[in-house]
Structure formats: structure tokens, C-alpha cells
Amino acid sequence: MHNSGAIGLALQGNITVDTVVAQGCRPIGQLMHITESRQNLLLGLDGQAPLNVLKELFQTMNDRDQALMQNSLFLGVVMDEFLDAPKQGDFLIRNVVGMDARTGTLAIGEELKEGQMVQFHLRDAETSSADLTAVLERFATDNRENQVQGALLFSCLGRGQYLYGHANHDTDIFHEKI
């Protein structure tokens, strides 16, 4: 296994490329609207300071989720603004990259716009593994008649040994299901 480098890939002919995404996060709290933002700064959620929303949410969580919130907190941005009831998989997951305790502002790894629907998310090994397994099984079922000739797996830094406690977790599931 290599930990650095680059790969080049050229494809030609009559090919179909399908994309499968496993976010590996589960929603927590309520769906909210961004009421104030500036670039990647989240200034208001339903008229409240985002950090205050998080503090209230924290008080309602069990010990395990409270621990996860301290280092595995994400913001899910609803991808389709016309969805009435977005569910897991309908969100573009973005990192919470900073916070200002004085103003209650959160910095997010995405430019935000007022009116967007968002919900906080947590990532844990169990949810992440189940999500990957489910999307790969669905892909395999949907493509049963097509012979898959190749596949590429791109995994983010938040997964792998850091999340699961051992190497190759995602690769093993990928190999088994595809």
C-alpha cells in the first residue's frame, strides 16, 4: 500500500460511469434554516446563534453522542431545496472547522447561503460502515445485469484506521460487495 503519489486514468470507448457516495453520518437535532451567514460563517439558525443551538442539543444527547459531538461534528446541507422531509443521504456533509464562543458563530467548510436547510450530523464507525454497506449493496443489486469491469474507491481522511481502529475497513467491504 502506498500513502502518497498520484494516479492517472484514461478511459475510452462506450463506457458508463456511475458514482456512489456514502457519507457515513447520521443526522442529529432538528432540520433548521440558515437565517444569517457570511461566506462560510454560520451566523444564525432559525434566528438563534448556532453555538447556542449546539449547546441545547448537547444537553439532550447521551454520553456517547456527547463525546462524538466534540470531535465528529458535521453540518449537513440539504442538496435539493424542494425536499419537504430530507433524510439521511439527502445532505452534503461539511466539516465544522471552527467556532467563536463570543459570538456563537460557526465556521463551516462550505460557503453558505441564507435560506438553506441544514442539520447537524455525527460520524461514528457503526453508522459509517452501515451506510457504505447499504449503498454498495444497492449498487450491486441495481447493476446485477451489468458486468462491472472496474471500480475506484476514494475514502476521506476521516475514515480508515482513525474511525474504525484498523486499516482497510472500507476496502474490505468494497471488495466484498462489488
Regions found by a protein language model. Give the residues of each.
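Small-residue-enriched flexible segments
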Residues: 1-164, 168-177
